[in-house]
Amino acid sequence: MIWRWVVVTILSAVACFHSSSHAQAVRISYSGLSGQNLPFWVTYEADLYKKYGLNAEMVLISGGLTNMQAVMAKEIAFTYLGGASPIQAIAQGADIVVLATAYGLMPYGLIASKNIHAAAELKGKRFVVSRLGGIEETAARVALDRLGVGARNVSFLQAGPDPLRIAALESGAAQATMLAPPGLFAATSRGLNLLADLGALKIKYPASVVSGRRSYLIQDRAVAKRFLMALIDGLHVYRQNKSFAVKVLEKYTKLTNADILSQSYDYFAKNNPLLPVSDGETIQAAVPTDKPGNRKVEEFYDNSILEELEREGFAKTLSK
């Protein structure tokens, strides 16, 4: 339960009234167990959706493509995932839009099995990702190109969440993967080799975005606004209360090593914005270059609700 040090405002009082009398059911999802999902989990665990009048059901749907399919089928209202899948869907004409960018840097490290010490040794080897076509494969291609290996020289295989991919490297079933904290730190603590840290390079990329249907934004804008109010509140709780956030990270990742959990929190918290607006340069990094047409980058995201909340001074009330 959220600590009661958040300043009570007229806005939150109204939201609380609505939450107790007319809670709006909303189904939301997240795509994986990496640390960049932590603000989303904190928002849920701190009961902030209820605070803003939403009765949220949160589910894990592994992989960006499957999340997009659920959103387009109207099974999910909002999903928290890497930017590649929604941006790809928008490029193909889908009724999708990015509503917020909660983490705008590439946070992955290239991890190799214990017997591989240089990137050149990865040629001809098996490279596992959680889902083919997802953000980890994108990160892998960036890393391999920067290391001079070339993604065409490895075989990409789908292997599921972090623990399964770490196990694949330890068993010899695969030789490399991409991991974000806490999986990244868990892997290196087990003796697996870090060949490249994309996070240290500060590469702009929409690693964690909120996406939904553009038509939903038009038809149920009030619900979308309350959802984003809850997320902004969650970002403030996440940044201001490390001990609570670390407990949430432990719950979702099932990791118990206090050093890894703390290190993972610190890795992300320093770069998480309190107002998760999207910017064109970050979004552009995930726009496919092989799609015809003259679509402008601004067509991929909509900051209008966040800008409205900024004009209203919403985030400032949470920082007091």
Task: Specify the residue positions occupied by each region the protein language model found.
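Secondary-structure end/capping motifs
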Residues: 218-294
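Conserved C-terminal helix/tail region of periplasmic/extracytoplasmic solute-binding proteins
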Residues: 288-320
